[in-house]
Curated annotation (Swiss-Prot):
One annotated GO molecular function: structural constituent of ribosome
This protein's encoding gene: rpsI
HAMAP family: Ribosomal_uS9_B
Alphabetical GO biological process terms: translation
Record's protein name: Small ribosomal subunit protein uS9
Pfam family, one: Ribosomal_S9
Keywords assigned by UniProt, alphabetized: Ribonucleoprotein, Ribosomal protein
Length: 134
């Protein structure tokens, strides 16, 4: 028989996808099957870590859950945003009363910005080749 997982949320940002499981616990972190002291050990950049755990901070649930995260695609910045949305959605499964707080800080909104495709005849998505008058 499978063990009880807890609360689940999926988050996406750019090309990153995160599946987040919250289990009642004391704040352990497991990312892609590997144990970490904190999320900072995975993301390295403190700004990305702070961004990812923001939903736990604003809802005062920081030490109440163990995080089990499967994240792939994109870079660390996009993964941080995906984890953030996944945690916020999992917290809603835990308690619907947290919705106004999470909504106030815009944590339930999927950031729709994606990389614009490169067009032919241009060097990048919008950058045209250098123009010479003479």
């Amino acid at each position: 028989m499978a063990e009880v997982i807890g609360y689940y949320g999926t988050g996406r940002r750019k090309t990153a996808v995160a599946r987040v499981y919250l289990r009642p616990g004391e704040g352990k972190v497991k990312v892609n099957g590997k144990e970490y002291e904190s999320l900072n050990d995975y993301f390295k950049n403190p700004a990305w870590t702070k961004h990812a755990i923001e939903p736990l901070e604003v809802t005062n649930t920081l030490g109440k859950f163990d995080l089990v995260i499967r994240v792939n695609g994109g870079g660390l910045s996009g993964q941080s945003g995906a984890v953030r949305l996944g945690i916020a959605r999992a917290l809603l499964q835990y308690d619907q009363k947290l919705r106004p707080v999470l909504k106030k800080y815009k944590m339930l909104t999927r950031d729709p910005r994606e990389v614009e495709r490169k067009k032919y005849g241009l060097k990048k998505a919008r950058r045209a080749p250098q123009f010479s008058k003479r």
